[in-house]
């Protein structure tokens, strides 16, 4: 089985998360996408982070697709960093082929992630274009360091079968939603009480 992993705070989850997942399912020919709702992002201020249970329920409501599974795995296995989550999944679920899914905004700062080179060496990565982040992402230290492992976009369906490091930059999905833009200054979610 080919599984895409989309990690994040999902604070709040929104239709772009769903659209990215469905886009990845199709373009990467995945069987499932797992949303890994993190207890907290080490690179972000977590003071306005809603309670994990509320984010999980909201994510389930937004996902609304049997191929998208919402998980709080990181809180269960007590991992803080993506590399630890990936290592645990690969060790426990050896028969699955994982692909890490991230937006271009995350590629732009991927070099700041704990053990980012090891992440790239453990699982193939699909980067979803997020204008206007495209140029910044593709000029980032991580993109430059991993440039020789980049697949042409027309080979995206082969990514899950490639040994890491391997990555692809997927274009064509034009959404400009972000969780940051859907939060009020006090951290509450816009459109909710």
UniProtKB/Swiss-Prot annotation:
GO terms for molecular function: ATP binding; nicotinate-nucleotide adenylyltransferase activity. InterPro entries: Cyt_trans-like, NadD/NMNAT, Rossmann-like_a/b/a_fold. It catalyses: nicotinate beta-D-ribonucleotide + ATP + H(+) = deamido-NAD(+) + diphosphate. It is an enzyme of class 2 (transferase). Pathway: Cofactor biosynthesis; NAD(+) biosynthesis; deamido-NAD(+) from nicotinate D-ribonucleotide: step 1/1. Its EC number is 2.7.7.18. GO terms for biological process: NAD biosynthetic process. Pfam families: CTP_transf_like. It comes from the Bacteria. Keywords: ATP-binding, NAD, Nucleotide-binding, Nucleotidyltransferase, Pyridine nucleotide biosynthesis, Transferase. Catalyzes the reversible adenylation of nicotinate mononucleotide (NaMN) to nicotinic acid adenine dinucleotide (NaAD). Belongs to the NadD family. This is Probable nicotinate-nucleotide adenylyltransferase. It comes from Bradyrhizobium diazoefficiens (strain JCM 10833 / BCRC 13528 / IAM 13628 / NBRC 14792 / USDA 110).
């Amino acid at each position: 089985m080919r599984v895409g992993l989309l990690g994040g705070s999902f604070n709040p989850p929104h239709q772009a998360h769903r659209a990215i997942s469905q886009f990845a399912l199709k373009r990467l020919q995945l069987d499932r996408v797992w949303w890994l709702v993190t207890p907290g992002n080490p690179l972000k201020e977590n003071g306005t982070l809603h309670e994990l249970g509320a984010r999980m329920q909201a994510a389930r409501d937004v996902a609304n697709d049997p191929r998208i599974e919402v998980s709080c795995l990181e809180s269960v296995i007590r991992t803080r960093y993506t590399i630890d989550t990936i290592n645990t999944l690969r060790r426990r679920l050896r028969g699955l082929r994982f692909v890490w899914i991230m937006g271009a905004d995350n590629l732009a700062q991927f070099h700041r992630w704990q053990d980012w080179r090891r992440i790239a060496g453990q699982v193939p990565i699909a980067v979803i274009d997020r204008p206007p982040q495209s140029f910044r992402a593709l000029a980032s230290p991580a993109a430059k360091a991993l440039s020789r492992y980049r697949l042409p976009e027309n080979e995206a369906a082969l990514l899950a079968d490639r040994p890491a490091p391997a990555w692809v930059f997927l274009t064509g999905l034009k959404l400009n939603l972000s969780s940051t833009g859907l939060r009020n200054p006090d951290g509450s979610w816009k459109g909710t009480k």
